[in-house]
Amino acid sequence: MKTFHLRKEDVKRDWYIIDAKGKNLGRLASLIANVLRGKHKPTFQPDVDCGDYVVVINADKFTVTGKKLTDKEYKFHTNAPGGLKVRNLQWMIEHKPTEALALAVERMLPKNKLQKRYMKRLKLYAGETHPHTAQNLKPLEEVSKLWKAI
């Protein structure tokens, strides 16, 4: 019996939708990262891009526990002298509503060549509307056993 190795041509990609309203940021990002990688599929292989598309609506209405709104910091540098910028989670939600969830998902993905491909399949929208109705979106709840933990 030969060992099965998944090829790009054999991958069938589905589209899933999830409403982030009231969901915990970390648990939601972890679930989305697993679906983007394809870990929910029985044919998962870490070196092959076999993940699915994920559409997230209400991406700015997630919840966090504790004092993370004021204490969690996002640091970036402008590459100018003295250009270190520090923003907290509350500022990110007010000024860049979907960026906080995108960063959480991106940081939960493996840091390799496939990370950019995974992130291109993540579609984040701050409101209820999205332009992906033609893709026959399935609710993400029916895929994951981890859904009860969110």
UniProtKB/Swiss-Prot annotation:
One of its GO terms (biological process) is translation. It comes from the Bacteria. It holds the Pfam family Ribosomal_L13. GO terms for molecular function: mRNA binding; structural constituent of ribosome. Keywords: Ribonucleoprotein, Ribosomal protein. The keyword Ribonucleoprotein applies. One of its GO terms (cellular component) is cytosolic large ribosomal subunit. PANTHER family: LARGE RIBOSOMAL SUBUNIT PROTEIN UL13M, RIBOSOMAL PROTEIN L13. NCBIfam families: rplM_bact. Part of the 50S ribosomal subunit. This protein is one of the early assembly proteins of the 50S ribosomal subunit, although it is not seen to bind rRNA by itself. It is important during the early stages of 50S assembly. Belongs to the universal ribosomal protein uL13 family. This is Large ribosomal subunit protein uL13. It comes from Sulfurihydrogenibium sp. (strain YO3AOP1). The lineage of its organism: Bacteria, Pseudomonadati, Aquificota, Aquificia, Aquificales.
